[in-house]
């Protein structure tokens, strides 16, 4: 799988295919998927992490089931913009996944995505236990929605129609 910038993905992405969002944690992988028009991100069940081979197989099954054309993977950049061990682990995961699939990936700054997701779940009056179960996929949705919004902006710029919704 190639690692692309969001601009490169916008040029290569075929129309009417879904994009998946991933929030890689140490215990789970939060998942979300776009609609075919790539306007909305919807959370999906998490993958409980076991070891890389099993995690990769589950992720590829998800991608096939959802007909995913690309992955947007949250990159856990520190608040000051520096990259720590979690960024290195995410990059290593993406590189290793690249040996197993041709589906391209974009690394997307995920700063505050989990905080935003938790606030939304609290506002929705989701219990603490259910929040713990849903937070990673909700964060994956925030990550993916940011990328979808950027893809839409790039598409409007490419078409010259800056006033389109």
Curated annotation (Swiss-Prot):
Organism: Sinorhizobium medicae (strain WSM419) (Ensifer medicae)
Top EC group: hydrolase
InterPro entries to which the protein is assigned, alphabetical: RNaseH-like_sf, YqgF, YqgF/RNaseH-like_dom, YqgF/RNaseH-like_dom_sf
Pfam families the record matches: RuvX (PF03652)
Functional summary from the UniProt entry: Could be a nuclease involved in processing of the 5'-end of pre-16S rRNA.
GO cellular component term, pick one: cytosol
Keywords: Cytoplasm, Hydrolase, Nuclease, Ribosome biogenesis
Record-listed E.C. numbers: 3.1.-.-
Signal peptide: none
Protein name per its UniProtKB record: Putative pre-16S rRNA nuclease
GO annotation, biological process: rRNA 5'-end processing
Main location (coarse class): cytoplasm
């Amino acid at each position: 799988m190639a690692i692309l910038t969001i601009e490169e993905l916008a040029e290569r992405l075929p129309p009417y295919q879904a994009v998946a969002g991933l929030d890689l944690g140490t215990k789970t992988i939060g998942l979300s998927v776009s609609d075919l028009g790539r306007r909305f991100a919807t959370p999906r069940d998490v993958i409980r992490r076991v070891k890389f081979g099993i995690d990769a197989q589950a992720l590829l099954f998800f991608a096939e089931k959802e007909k995913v054309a690309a992955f947007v993977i949250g990159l856990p950049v520190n608040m000051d913009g520096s990259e720590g061990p979690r960024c290195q682990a995410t990059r290593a995961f993406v590189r290793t996944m690249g040996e197993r699939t041709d589906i391209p990936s974009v690394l997307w700054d995920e700063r505050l995505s989990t905080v935003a997701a938790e606030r939304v779940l609290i506002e929705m009056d989701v219990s603490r236990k259910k929040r713990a179960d849903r937070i990673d996929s909700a964060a994956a949705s925030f990550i993916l929605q940011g990328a979808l919004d950027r893809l839409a902006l790039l598409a409007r710029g490419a078409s010259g129609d800056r006033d389109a919704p």
